[in-house]
Amino acid sequence: MNAYPVTDAVTYVGADDPDLALFEGQYPVRPIGVSYNSYVITDQKIAVMDTVDARVTEAWLENLDYALDGRTPDYLIISHMEPDHAANIARLAALYPEMKLVGNAKTFVMLRQFFGPDAAPADHLVTVGEGDVLELGSHRLRFFLAPMVHWPEVMVTYEESEKLLFSADAFGRFGALSLTEKAPWAPQARRYYLNIVGKYGAQVQALLKKLASLPVEAILPLHGPVLTQEIGRCLELYDLWSSYRPEEPDRVLVAYASIYGHTKQAALALADLLTERGADVTTCDLTTTHVSDALTQAFCCGKLVLASVTYDGGLFPPMEELLNHLKAKNFQNRKIGLMENGSWAPQAARLMRARLEEMKNLTLCPTAVSIRSALNEGSRQQLQQLADELLAP
């Protein structure tokens, strides 16, 4: 059991999933896993804040039983209907048939889709809208709709007396709490945000504006730790990420996709040139780095170099995968350099340029380095030109 008090009235009852390999079936989280968070607010009336993934049902029920201490919950607040948070709604409703479910209109559409038309009696559904308040006693829950952060039915809850923000998936982080207790929040929160929520920057900006006037003493997300320190910094990072601005505008990421090492050699030669000129440079081998990590690095940097071999007349799949993910997550506002390699018909630069032109507000350097099999004097001169263009103001 890992239930613990957040405040005198709020208890954490979530559960860790340290053995999960892929979050959402695609993002590697082993060996740190993930947490599925749920909370109980105890007052004259009791509210359970969300359920958990089916993988951790029994651990959650044990924690919940401890927190309730024989009492019956009056409300289940449903922040988000994604199954890693909503899988146990029907189970909890069956255990406590008098409990009411609190959500917005879109919540209950999805509730019926997941659990059937008779998921809950109509008189057990409490529909709330923007700014509505639910009184528990001395605790007052105010609801704010957060559509597409990152599903359409999402809402966040602000507890007014203790100034607590129950933030749904916003401000979440990868990592089971038992395994990442002392880990800094930002690295895995950044990777989580950019890969899970990153497409919806405008919607996150809208939510941040709604919350701007609220004093917040703690943020209680559905993944990762409860945030009680440096909340201002967490809000600043969310504002930065959701506005598609780089955290490190002058840093250059050189991401390369190489088969036999010649494209890698050229990419590292460019990285050396840039470093010699005082640039902060990071390199990324796309054949060994998961695309979620490469994407995270790309969003951090103000400048990106893409170096790819030509493959079957097209892009080498690791580079194509990165470009697909960058487009899907709304990558923008960066300076881009291109490098290609091909032994008889290099096509990668043209194809990468075409994909990048589908994205917003990207500045492509005029020089695209074109290599025939291996670096030679001519392509080394192109590297010099590209380095000049990348570092130009």
Residues covered by each model-derived region:
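Structural motif
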Residues: 45-47, 75, 139, 163-166, ...
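Conserved beta-strand hairpin/beta-sheet module of binuclear metal-dependent hydrolase folds
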Residues: 3-65, 156-159, 163-167, 263
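Active-site neighborhood of phospho(di)ester-bond hydrolases with catalytic His/Asp-centered motifs
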Residues: 49-51, 73-81, 101-104, 165-168, ...
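FMN-binding flavodoxin-like domain, especially the glycine-rich phosphate-binding loop
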Residues: 177-219, 223-226, 269-282, 294-393
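Terminal amphipathic helices with adjacent charged low-complexity linkers/tails
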Residues: 223-249
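Active-site metal-binding motif and surrounding structural segment of the metallo-beta-lactamase
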Residues: 44, 55-102
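Metallo-beta-lactamase
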Residues: 4-8, 103-154, 200-208
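Short, charged N-terminal beta->alpha structural module
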Residues: 255-277
